[in-house]
Amino acid sequence: MRVYEYLYKGDPKMKVFVTGVAGQLGHDVMNDLAARGYEGIGTDIAPQYSGADDGTAVTKMPYVSLDITDRDAVEKTITELKPDVVVHCAAWTAVDLAEDDDKKAKVHAINADGTQNIADACKKIDAKMVYISTDYVFDGQGTTPWQPDCKDYAPLNVYGQTKLDGELAVANTLEKYFIVRIAWVFGVNGKNFIKTMLNVGKTHDKLTVVSDQIGTPTYTLDLSRLLVDMIETDKYGYYHATNEGGYISWYDFTKEIFKQAVELGHTEYSEDRLTVAPVTTAEYGVSKAARPFNSRLDKSKLVENGFKPLPTWQDALHRYLQEIEF
C-alpha cells in the first residue's frame, strides 16, 4: 500500500471534479486529492467506479457517471456540483484504433467535442481546468526538445489531431487553464508498455524493440502530485511534464525494465534467457497510426514557475515494479 506524505497547504474547501477515474491517471489524481484533504469527485462513463479495486481512497470517494460527449449532461453535472477545478483525464487513447474509419467520429467526439463541453461548463462556473495532452500534437521530427509554448502543431495521426483540437478548445474558451502534455504514460491502473513487455518477456526468448523513437516515460503517480500542485496555484498555461532522467528510446526503456525486474528476483528476464534487439521503426513494420520519432519534451518551464520536477524515470520504474504483480 502506498504511503502518502504531504505538507498540507491547500484550501480544505477546494472541490475538484476528475474525469476518467477508471484510467491510470484519474485514479492517482483522486488519491492525491484525498491525501491532501481536498474534496475529490470522480467520473467516468461506467455506471459505477470501474477502475482498479485496490482499496485506495478513490474506490470509496464520490463518483458520478457521465458521458462527456453529452453536452447537456456535462453542463448539468458541472454546474450543479460547482467544482473549483476540473481535472480532465478522460480521453480516447487507443492510437491505432483511432485510424479506423468507423472510429474517427467517436474519437473526435470524445477528445475534441467532449473537451469543449467541459471547457464551456468550466467557463459558466469560473472553474479552473486541467487538460491532459500529448507530444502527438507535434510532428515528431528533428532532435530538439519541444517547448510547451511552441505552436508548430502538425499531428501525424487522428489521435494527435483530436488531442490538439481539445487543447485549442480549452485555450480558446478559458483563461484559467493548465494544458499539460505528457508522454509514454504508465500507471498501476491500466494497460501500458511496461506491463506489455513484462508479459511478452515471459513467453519469448527474443524481442525486437524500436530504438529510433526518443522520449521520456511518465509515471501517473508522480504526475498526479504535480497536477495537484498546479491547481493550488494560478500559474496557468501550457506545460510539459514527464519524469526526469534523460531522453531514451523504447529499446533503452525495455532493457532497464528487464534489468530492474531481475534485480527484484525475476530471473526469467535475465539476459541469458531473453535477448532484446534494437530495430528501427521501418524495420519493425508499419503501424496503423504514424508515431513521432522525437517525443522529447522540454520541462524547464515547470521549474521556472516554481513547480517541483518529477523524479527520474529510473526511480519511477523501480517504485512501479514494486507496486504491480508480474
Regions found by a protein language model. Name each.
Residues 168-229:
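NAD(P)-dependent short-chain dehydrogenase/reductase
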Residues 188, 213-222, 242-260, 319:
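Substrate-binding strand-loop-helix patch
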Residues 303, 311-326:
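Amphipathic terminal alpha-helices
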Residues 16-34:
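N-terminal Rossmann NAD(P)H-binding glycine-rich loop of SDR-like oxidoreductase domains
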Residues 68-110:
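NAD(P)H-binding glycine-rich loop region in Rossmannoid oxidoreductase-like domains
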Residues 105-114, 137-180, 184-185:
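Catalytic helix-loop patch of NAD(P)-dependent Rossmann-fold dehydrogenases
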Residues 233-287:
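Mid/C-terminal beta-alpha module of Rossmann-like enzyme folds, strongest
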